[in-house]
């Protein structure tokens, strides 16, 4: 129910589901582990009407979010909406990573963790018990916007860091 319209170096998201932008340009991996792992990825969630410049990575919120609340968790006097964020048991489930990012942004916490695994593995798969722990954490440029003006909670979240560790 959403799309990312790309025109040159500009992206605009349309639709209520939003889009997750994954920036791996500064990420690293440890090849010696022999399985997927990642350190230092960046995630941004863009909602309906939000824009992203692919060259500068500058995120511009939609007009209704720009008119709402700007959230900078490092700002003096920051008053978080959430006091806690749960450990997410199915972090790649429908909407789970976006909720985790929003809760992290608008809380005093520095990080949120969650698990991802495939319960439908083949019995002879040597990595059948392998899953991943995703660690989402605030970076120096993690900020966001919030608006409830259109009848539902709507967050735009910029530059949450991501580490993925095999478990």
Put a short name on every predicted segment.
Residues 1-167:
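C-terminal and late-domain segments of enzyme folds
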């Amino acid at each position: 129910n959403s799309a990312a319209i790309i025109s040159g170096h500009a992206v605009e998201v349309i639709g209520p589901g939003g889009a997750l932008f994954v920036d791996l340009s500064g990420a690293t991996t440890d090849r010696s582990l022999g399985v997927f792992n990642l350190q230092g990825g960046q995630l941004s969630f863009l909602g309906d009407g939000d824009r992203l410049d692919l060259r500068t990575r500058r995120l511009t919120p939609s007009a209704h979010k720009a008119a709402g609340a700007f959230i900078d968790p490092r700002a003096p006097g920051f008053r978080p909406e959430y006091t806690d964020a749960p450990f997410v048991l199915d972090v790649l489930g429908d909407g789970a990573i976006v909720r985790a990012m929003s809760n992290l942004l608008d809380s005093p916490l520095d990080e949120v963790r969650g698990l991802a695994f495939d319960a439908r593995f083949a019995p002879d798969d040597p990595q059948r018990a392998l899953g991943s722990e995703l660690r989402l954490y605030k970076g120096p440029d993690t900020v966001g916007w919030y608006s409830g003006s259109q009848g539902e909670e709507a967050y735009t979240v910029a530059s949450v860091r991501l580490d993925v560790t095999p478990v």
